[in-house]
Amino acid sequence: MNKKNQWIVGINAVVSSIENDAEHVREVLVEAASKNSRLLDIEENARRKGIEVRRVTTQALDGVGGGVRHQGVAARYAAVRLWEEHDLKDLVDAAGGQALLLVLDGVQDPHNLGACLRSAAAAGVTAVIIPKDKSVGINATVRKTSSGAADRLPVIAVVNLARSLRELQKQDVWIYGLAGEVETSLYALDLRGNVALVLGGEADGLRRLTREHCDVLARIPMPGEVESLNVSVAAGVTLFEAVRQRTLV
C-alpha cells in the first residue's frame, strides 16, 4: 500500500472532501483576495472539523492547481491509498458475491473519467479498473470533475486489461461489455451478483481483445436519432440499471 500527498482543487471537490473524508484532508488553501461567500463557508466548515486553513495568494493556488481552474480554493489530501493490481482479488472476495465493477477501456478525456468516477461512487461500485496505457490517469482535472470520488474509490490501473478480465472470470465475475451494434439489450441482462461492466473509450469503443473477453455484449436501447452516448452518460445509465436490479424488493 502506497500513500502520498495530493492536491484537490475547485469548490465542489473541496467541499465534498471535507464533508465525506475530512480525516484525510490535511489543510485547505483559500484565496486571500476572494470575496466569494462559498469560500468563507468552506473555511468555517474546515476549521470546525479541525482542518488547518491558510489564506494564500492567487499565484500560490495556481502553483498547486497544475493549470486546472481552482476557483480560489485547494485542499491537500493526504494518506490516499494507491490501489495495486493485486488488490483486485481481495476487493472482489470482500464483496461477498455482490461485487460491482466498472471497467473503462481507454477513456482519454479527464472530464469523462471524472464523471464516470462520480457516477461509480454514487452507485457504490466495488472498484474501477482502467488500463495503464491508452487511458488518462488520475490527475487534478479528474479529481475536480469527480468531486473527490477519485480519491475515495478503489481505482486500479492494470497492465493487461484482457488478463485482468480473465482473472475476474476465475472469481465468478460475469463480464458484460457495452457495444452499440449488437442486438442484446442492457435491460435483458441479469446484473445481480458479481458483475463487471465494461465500456470503451470515446473514439473506438471496446478494443478487440477486450470484446473477446466479455461474456456478453449488450447495447443501451436508443430510439432517437442519435446513435451513441457520451461514455460518462453510458456509464451512469448502465451502473444504475445494475443498482435498480440489486435493490428490487
From Swiss-Prot:
Documented EC number(s): 2.1.1.185
Gene coding for it: rlmB
Entry keyword annotation includes S-adenosyl-L-methionine: yes
SMART domains reported for this sequence: SpoU_sub_bind (SM00967)
Main location as per UniProt: cytoplasm
Positions bound to S-adenosyl-L-methionine: 200, 220, 229
HAMAP family: 23SrRNA_methyltr_B
Reaction(s) catalysed by this chain's protein: guanosine(2251) in 23S rRNA + S-adenosyl-L-methionine = 2'-O-methylguanosine(2251) in 23S rRNA + S-adenosyl-L-homocysteine + H(+)
Methyltransferase in keyword set: yes
GO cellular component terms attached to this protein's record: cytosol
Species the sequence originates in: Xylella fastidiosa (strain Temecula1 / ATCC 700964)
UniProt keywords, alphabetically: Cytoplasm, Methyltransferase, rRNA processing, S-adenosyl-L-methionine, Transferase
Any Pfam family: SpoU_methylase
Compartment(s) of residence: Cytoplasm
Residues annotated as transmembrane: none
Protein family membership: Belongs to the class IV-like SAM-binding methyltransferase superfamily. RNA methyltransferase TrmH family. RlmB subfamily.
GO function terms (MF aspect): RNA binding; rRNA (guanosine-2'-O-)-methyltransferase activity
Name listed for the protein in its UniProt record: 23S rRNA (guanosine-2'-O-)-methyltransferase RlmB
EC main group: transferase
Function: Specifically methylates the ribose of guanosine 2251 in 23S rRNA.
Gene3D superfamilies the record matches: 3.30.1330.30, 3.40.1280.10
Superkingdom of origin organism: Bacteria
